[in-house]
Amino acid sequence: MINWESNQTQLALKEIQSAVQMYGRGSRVVRLAYCYRRLRNLVYYGVQQQLQNCFCHPHLDSSKLHILLHLRGGLGDCASYRVCILALREKLPNAVFHYYTDSPHAAEVLFEADEKNVLLPSGKIPYRRAYDMACELCISFKTVYVNHARIQQLAPDFLPVLTLSLSRQKKLSFFLQDNYLLDDALGRFLYWQGAEKLEAQRYLSALDFDVAQTGSLPDSILKKDVSGYGLKKPYITLHSGIDATFNMKGSTPLKCWPKENWSTFVKLFREKFPHIQIVQLGGENSPKFDFVDVCLVGKSSLQDLPALLAGSTLHIDGESGLVQLTRWLPTRAVVLFANTAASLFALPKNINLTSDKCGACMWLEGPSWHTRCMLGYSSCQNMQTYTPEYVLEIVSRHLAA
């Protein structure tokens, strides 16, 4: 756990801020570019919110608190945010939570729509000031609007937590003022501190939760009928790909195991476990394997994934959204870590394979870190260390347990 108040931590954060601002010290053009970005964001989102106020202003029951939660990132990100959200739910048991996700339908995989949970459609961000509190969750936790009078009226016991949260957010205001840009820098800070990804959310939200928490999804999600896919138990699931909303531009993600390795692994696995069906899952950014028993790439809905994974004897994957989803499933995963750090993303319940042949380059150079090696290699050197024979040995050991 990070001691956020220590002088060492404060200096480390100041170092990042100084590095980000470095080129601006001697260049008026760079300083103007930063100002332009802040002004553009202010105007763009301000106009967008005003339009939402005019045309899509929600009518909410004034007898209850209404909390807007904007969950940024892909399915895996949203799955991890559920830890923070459950902690917030404990503090506000009677509030109505409204979920808006950047990744379409992600909330439907994680939350059951009822009188206390409203799943909003994708599209434009709802008008934030229509709610009593609006928060953005990514690596950070940012309160973008709060109606203090309403909180005082309907949830006075929450005020100390809110006050502490806002004071902490003020201390990290440099990162939060443009969190779309600087969340990556905050993520790198967590990495070098040896912390887990949710550590910043825990601090900024002032919610006391276990960053390694696991649990279960609602039965209506977990036990959904997926018999129509014709799967026969026992089966294992494979996945190779990243968030479907990411534009791959024909590239292969560095965090994905090469197709030839998958092919060899499946051949060896089938020889050793002929009675276990091999099922491939995936979305638009996943290649289709013709050597598996059942390929559901592009054929299964996002909403069916929890039930499909829950029925699996074992899931095998790179670090991905499906792996993060196992936090809330009975299924364990064998995870091949490549260019993302296990210290940040690994779940203790899973079998996490790591390599020190190279480092972890996540969040460097913007989105290109997904597909382009900064050191010029054609593929991730960490991922190259996992041979099909080695992975089969790990999988066999788990299946025999």
Show the residue positions of the predicted features:
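Catalytic machinery of carbohydrate-active enzymes
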Residues: I2-A401
